[in-house]
Every structure is written in C-alpha cells, then in structure tokens.
C-alpha cells in the first residue's frame, strides 16, 4: 500500500496569512502524465469536501485561495490568504494504486 505522510499534524495560522501543508507518498503516484493526488477539507460532522484533484486542479466552486502543487512523491496544499472558514482538517489522498489511501490529516486552527 502507498503510505501518505502529512506534515505538520497541526498548525495555527493568523487570518490573512499563508498555510502550507505537505504530503509525501512512499512511492510515486504519477501515471499517464498525471499525478493521482487529491486534497480534501473536512469539518466536524461533515463529509470530506474535495478541494484539489490531480495535484493542482481546483474543484469547481472552491476559492482560488486554495492551490496544489507537486508530482511523483511530494505534494503541497497552500491556502493563501487563510480565512476564518478554513479552520478544518485537511487530507491528502492517492488513487494511483489500489487500495486508495489517505494521509493522517492536518488540523488547521486560526490564531
């Protein structure tokens, strides 16, 4: 199974500042010219919401404050600027190889 390691486990960011979350895969998640890495936001009591698909593509309706980058094994989710509504837990997920796997999550708190 591909293991996804997120860092940091938690972070506190002031409103208007930048938040950066990293996800490292134990092996490449690239195939056919795409990176099969996705990012989700989850708030308590709610299902996960897809933010970024295929490493860098913004899901419809998601603010452009969210962006994703990376390839092969190293990926980043950036939120810039952070707004109050962004307090949540963020997960990376790969589906290049079965079984699909998730990172352990990064909890974003507002200072």
Swiss-Prot record:
It comes from the Eukaryota. PROSITE patterns: IG_LIKE. Residues 61-92 are annotated as: Framework-3. Gene3D superfamilies: Immunoglobulins. InterPro entries: Ig-like_dom, Ig-like_dom_sf, Ig-like_fold, Ig_sub, Ig_V-set, IgV_Light_Chain. One of its GO terms (cellular component) is immunoglobulin complex. Keywords: Adaptive immunity, Disulfide bond, Immunity, Immunoglobulin. Residues 39-53 are annotated as: Framework-2. One of its GO terms (biological process) is adaptive immune response. Residues 24-38 are annotated as: Complementarity-determining-1. Residues 1-23 are annotated as: Framework-1. Residues 93-101 are annotated as: Complementarity-determining-3. CDD domains: IgV_L_kappa. The keyword Disulfide bond applies. This is Ig kappa chain V-III region PC 4050. It comes from Mus musculus.
């Amino acid at each position: 199974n591909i293991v996804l390691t997120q860092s940091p486990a938690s972070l506190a960011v002031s409103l208007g500042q930048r938040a950066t979350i990293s996800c490292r895969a134990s092996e490449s998640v690239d195939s056919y010219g795409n990176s099969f890495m996705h990012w989700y936001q989850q708030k308590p009591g709610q299902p996960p919401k897809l933010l970024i698909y295929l490493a860098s593509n913004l899901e419809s309706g998601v603010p452009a404050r969210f962006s994703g980058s990376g390839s092969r094994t190293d990926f980043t989710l950036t939120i810039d600027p952070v707004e109050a509504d962004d307090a949540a837990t963020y997960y990376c997920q790969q589906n290049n190889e079965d079984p699909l796997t998730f990172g352990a999550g990064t909890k974003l708190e507002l200072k």
